[in-house]
A protein has these predicted regions:
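Bacterial N-terminal signal peptides that target proteins for export
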Residues: 1-8
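Chalcogenol-based redox active-site neighborhoods
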Residues: 18-197
Length: 197
């Protein structure tokens, strides 16, 4: 049953985006409780954009198959994003306690990238993403994560937005495998960096 739940979560997360914001749209500004290396803080998109482009990546849930891969790939490539002048923030419907663990976990975020809590799904919805509560009759609330713990919340679509300092969406990446999502995001910020330079 555990494997079936994880498989369903990965399947739904790989589906194409429903009606996500597109290139040229204004990215909704947000502040959210977040964690970096297990330490809580308030993440502000407006503040992050003052330093350069921001990769805002929505993922279904910490400690699930595809999300673990995606966080790990962002962490191991974090210096490449920084070299292109971009920062990265993950957003999920996980509570902050779960994100404190995930952000510090050396296998996943590895203390390199912040993850923000969107517990009610309001940020995801503002980016025109679906918040999914069940798939084929199985509730995300009762699915188990890779540690055997109940996920306990709904899930946002796996979609990544590249937001430029002027607050516009430069790219929307969805409907691809977690590792490909990260590589496409890196390509997008590197292209932005080349245009700027």
């Amino acid at each position: 049953m555990k494997r079936a739940g994880l498989g369903l979560l990965m399947l739904v997360a790989a589906l194409p985006t429903f009606a996500a914001l597109k290139q040229g749209d204004s990215a909704p500004q947000f502040k959210a409780q977040a964690s970096l290396a297990g330490k809580e803080f308030t993440f502000s998109l407006a503040d992050a954009l003052k330093k350069g482009p921001v990769v805002v990546y929505f993922y279904p849930s910490a400690y699930t198959g595809g999300c673990n891969v995606q966080a790990h790939e962002f962490a191991v490539n974090y210096d490449k994003f920084a070299a292109a002048g971009a920062s990265v923030v993950g957003v999920s419907l996980d509570n902050i306690s779960r994100l404190n663990e995930f952000s510090a976990d050396p296998e996943y975020c590895a203390g390199k990238l912040p993850v923000a809590s969107d517990a009610k799904g309001d940020i995801a919805k503002s980016y025109d993403l679906q918040v999914i509560t069940e798939y084929k009759g199985q509730s995300f609330l009762t699915m188990k994560d890779t540690r055997g713990k109940e996920i306990g919340h709904a899930a946002a679509e796996r979609t990544t937005f590249i937001v430029t300092p002027d607050g516009k969406v430069a790219a929307t990446i969805g409907g691809v495998a977690p590792k490909d999502n990260v590589m496409k995001a890196l390509e997008a910020v590197q292209q932005l960096s080349q245009k700027k330079g």
